[in-house]
């Protein structure tokens, strides 16, 4: 519609933006319609006031040819791979830097998503989904399980004070595979000891098949090969419909936008495993998993 206002002799159109999407008028102005526009690309490497150390960290972490570096450093449009599960463009549109979830569109629950580190370089991450607003509440490396349980209890109590109008349960969806079982057991003990009746501990084995004892479970099991894929699909759907606001955290955005998927031999969608991502030189998607758990 805006192009229709340019019929006047001296009318001009100025567009400024981050090149996150590979569609739309802004993308066309730099590609198929480039002859109609005078395009300027700002490369952060050539800007004096930009912290060059941050640029090098991004390159080291995600690779100089990654979409994260292309968009956030070079000012270039992403070369979106067909097998990436959640496109960078839709994640950016829900970033708290650009988007604020309307108060009348809040989700009716508060959930803590807890992803427990498996190895020394992995992170233990606690994400809080407070009625649709996702925020990192704790990030730890090399922390023992009891300290992680203490983090969860502290965040639970903090959340009750921050949201006095919310009277429902506060769910803790915790990665119960491997080391996570110890945190689950301790949380159940503390809940009983301190009579934390609004604390609902939900152990999740993300590697398991989807339970089919409900209608929703049966429908999900027709499309997704395991619980991890289903959780990420739910997160993707919320992002696509702008039903959540995701904290503007570079690591979270990168992890969400680089995880791939495939069609398994049974015809169902299956998301890339953590070990497969590490073989590609990527970090374990701890933040992405915690966000999906929440």
Model-derived regions: residue spans:
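Well-ordered alpha-helical segments embedded in enzymatic catalytic cores
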Residues: 1, 125, 147-155, 289
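Mg2+-dependent endonuclease catalytic cores in nucleic-acid-processing enzymes, primarily RNase H-like
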Residues: 22-25, 130-268
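ATPase catalytic-site recognition across NTP-hydrolyzing enzymes
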Residues: 47-114
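Gly/Thr-rich phosphate-binding beta-strand-loop-beta motif of the actin/hexokinase/Hsp70
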Residues: 105-130
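Charge-patterned, long linear interaction tracts outside catalytic cores
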Residues: 113-114, 247-294
